[in-house]
């Protein structure tokens, strides 16, 4: 083992909410922020997406329970971008990412994005036309965010999405400075793309995303999605930064 992560390396998880009382995060939470309340009061949600995502990247080791995250000794910055009804906006996600960057996060995980349900009924040519010619204002905005992240030596990792369409239709995934993660099904031999995963030229890398075991609520659960694949890569980035 070269490293299990350094406490000097901080990982921000931008997500709907978190159970910060979960034992997997004991002693490693710093700089928690709720963009809706403008405070450090962070809540768990009924669909405990954020807690599960955070555990994949950061769950503790040697605590006699559950699972171990990819970077179990790195610091954890939880950033809640959903309100009490689990509503999120592009602005709240942007606020969360920028907060994490200026808070000094070394890597930011964003397992969130636009729902593109139904677009898989259209050909890849039509999907590529959307990427090439639409949402250009948003694309320029996200390019600026990535420039800010690069200036602060921060890596942004996005989940590719679960609509079985081309990655990059969502303009937050188009910047060269970000990492976009698709999902594979580890049960397939040879390993293949998960049925739901977005894919294509704007996908940077793939990681397991089917039946991933992690912290959830007060316990643990299996979840599937590119949301689960992204924090595996986020944890790896944190490990790489820990040995530099």
Question: Where would I find each of the regions flagged by the language model?
Answer:
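A structural motif
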Residues: 10-15, 181, 205-206
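Alpha-helix termini
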Residues: 2-3, 64, 144-149, 244
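Hydrolase catalytic cores
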Residues: 54-57, 77-83, 106, 192, ...
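Active-site core segment of subtilase-fold serine proteases
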Residues: 1-77, 81-88, 92-137, 187
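Generic alpha-helical secondary structure signal
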Residues: 24, 204-207
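Substrate-binding/specificity loop regions of serine endopeptidase catalytic domains
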Residues: 67, 90, 113-204, 211-234
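Small-residue (primarily alanine) positions within well-ordered alpha-helices
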Residues: 12, 96, 100, 105, ...
């Amino acid at each position: 083992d070269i490293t299990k992560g350094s406490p000097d390396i901080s990982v921000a998880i931008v997500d709907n909410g978190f159970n910060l009382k979960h034992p997997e995060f004991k002693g490693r939470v710093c700089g928690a922020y709720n963009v809706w309340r403008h405070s450090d009061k962070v809540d768990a949600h009924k669909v405990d997406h954020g807690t599960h995502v955070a555990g994949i990247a950061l769950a503790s080791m040697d605590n006699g329970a559950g699972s171990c995250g990819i970077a179990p000794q790195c610091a954890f910055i939880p950033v809640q971008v959903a309100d009490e009804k689990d509503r999120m906006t592009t602005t709240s996600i942007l606020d969360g990412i920028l907060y994490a960057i200026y808070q000094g996060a070394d890597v930011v995980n964003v397992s969130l994005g636009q729902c593109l349900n139904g677009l898989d009924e259209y050909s890849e040519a039509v999907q590529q036309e959307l990427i090439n010619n639409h949402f250009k204002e948003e694309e320029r905005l996200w390019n600026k965010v990535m420039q800010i992240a690069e200036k602060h030596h921060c890596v942004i990792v996005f989940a590719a999405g679960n609509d079985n369409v081309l990655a990059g239709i969502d303009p937050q995934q188009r910047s060269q400075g970000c990492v976009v993660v698709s999902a594979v099904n580890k049960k397939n031999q040879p390993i293949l793309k998960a049925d739901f995963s977005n894919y294509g030229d704007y996908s940077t890398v793939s990681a397991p995303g089917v039946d991933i075991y992690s912290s959830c609520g007060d316990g643990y659960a299996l979840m599937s999605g590119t949301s689960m694949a992204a924090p595996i890569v986020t944890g790896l980035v944190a490990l790489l930064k820990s040995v530099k």
